[in-house]
């Protein structure tokens, strides 16, 4: 795994990448989301088994994140063309179908390296999840081994907890979103 530049309490590594947004290609930069929280999650590859369940789960809950002033971005080492092909493949045929979140292409693997999730021997990303606050500061890092996905509810809970502590200082455990 690459060591990366992502550190809790420090500015999140900046990025610029081509994404598939609403079925079209668009350049996306971290600075586009200044003033908003960002949940940035990495997944290994398109057209795999666990990845679509996570991506669809985040997409289905995108509005819950938007209500918190938070955007969700998915990233893999696949190209924007592969992302679009996966999105254009119906869910019943192993595809994603239409999404409510952007998928970023990291074909150079720079984002995966910068965020420390690159599995260098395979050239793919571990399942990393990063929460970045509205000032661009990295607040949370989780990296899972390849077979285990992330919980959308836990990501929502963490965003709510960080937003609460931003406003009120330290707080209780925040058991649920």
Swiss-Prot record:
InterPro entries, per the entry: AhpC/TSA (IPR000866), Peroxiredoxin (IPR050217), Peroxiredoxin_AhpC-typ (IPR024706), Thioredoxin-like_sf (IPR036249), Thioredoxin_domain (IPR013766)
A GO biological-process term: defense response to tumor cell
Residues with Phosphoserine modification: 112
Enzyme Commission number(s): 1.11.1.24
Oxidoreductase keyword on record: yes
Family: Belongs to the peroxiredoxin family. AhpC/Prx1 subfamily.
Keywords: Acetylation, Antioxidant, Cytoplasm, Disulfide bond, Oxidoreductase, Peroxidase, Phosphoprotein, Redox-active center
UniProt entry tagged with the keyword Acetylation: yes
Compartment(s) where it occurs, according to its Swiss-Prot or TrEMBL record: Cytoplasm
Organism expressing this protein natively: Pongo abelii (Sumatran orangutan)
Reaction equations catalysed: a hydroperoxide + [thioredoxin]-dithiol = an alcohol + [thioredoxin]-disulfide + H2O
Role this protein plays: Thiol-specific peroxidase that catalyzes the reduction of hydrogen peroxide and organic hydroperoxides to water and alcohols, respectively. Plays a role in cell protection against oxidative stress by detoxifying peroxides and as sensor of hydrogen peroxide-mediated signaling events. Might participate in the signaling cascades of growth factors and tumor necrosis factor-alpha by regulating the intracellular concentrations of H(2)O(2).
Primary location group: cytoplasm
Residues annotated as the enzyme's active site: 51 (cysteine sulfenic acid (-soh) intermediate)
Subunit structure: Homodimer; disulfide-linked, upon oxidation. 5 homodimers assemble to form a ring-like decamer. Interacts with TIPIN.
GO cellular component, one term: cytosol
Matching SUPFAM superfamilies: Thioredoxin-like
The protein's name: Peroxiredoxin-2
PTM comment text: The enzyme can be inactivated by further oxidation of the cysteine sulfenic acid (C(P)-SOH) to sulphinic acid (C(P)-SO2H) instead of its condensation to a disulfide bond. It can be reactivated by forming a transient disulfide bond with sulfiredoxin SRXN1, which reduces the cysteine sulfinic acid in an ATP- and Mg-dependent manner. Acetylation increases resistance to transition to high molecular-mass complexes. Deacetylated by HDAC6 which decreases reducing activity.
Residue intervals of the Thioredoxin domain: 6-164
Residues carrying N-acetylalanine: 2
Remaining remarks: The active site is a conserved redox-active cysteine residue, the peroxidatic cysteine (C(P)), which makes the nucleophilic attack on the peroxide substrate. The peroxide oxidizes the C(P)-SH to cysteine sulfenic acid (C(P)-SOH), which then reacts with another cysteine residue, the resolving cysteine (C(R)), to form a disulfide bridge. The disulfide is subsequently reduced by an appropriate electron donor to complete the catalytic cycle. In this typical 2-Cys peroxiredoxin, C(R) is provided by the other dimeric subunit to form an intersubunit disulfide.
MF-aspect GO terms: thioredoxin peroxidase activity
Database matches in PANTHER family: PEROXIREDOXIN-2, THIOREDOXIN PEROXIDASE
């Amino acid at each position: 795994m690459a060591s990366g530049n992502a550190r809790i309490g420090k500015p999140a590594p900046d990025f610029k990448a081509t994404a598939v947004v609403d079925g079209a290609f668009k350049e996306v930069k971290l600075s586009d989301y200044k003033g908003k929280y960002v949940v940035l999650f990495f997944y290994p590859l398109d057209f795999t088994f666990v990845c679509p369940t996570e991506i669809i789960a985040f997409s289905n809950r995108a509005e819950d994140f938007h209500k918190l002033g938070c955007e969700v971005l998915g990233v893999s080492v696949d190209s924007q063309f592969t992302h679009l092909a996966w999105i254009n493949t119906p869910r019943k045929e192993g595809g994603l179908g239409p999404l409510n979140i952007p998928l970023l292409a990291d074909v150079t693997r720079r984002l995966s390296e910068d965020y420390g999730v690159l599995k260098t021997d395979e050239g793919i990303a571990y399942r990393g999840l990063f929460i970045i606050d509205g000032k661009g500061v990295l607040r949370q890092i989780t990296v899972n081994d390849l077979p285990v996905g992330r919980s959308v509810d836990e990501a929502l809970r963490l965003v709510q907890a960080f937003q609460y502590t931003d406003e009120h200082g330290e707080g209780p455990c925040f058991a649920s979103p």
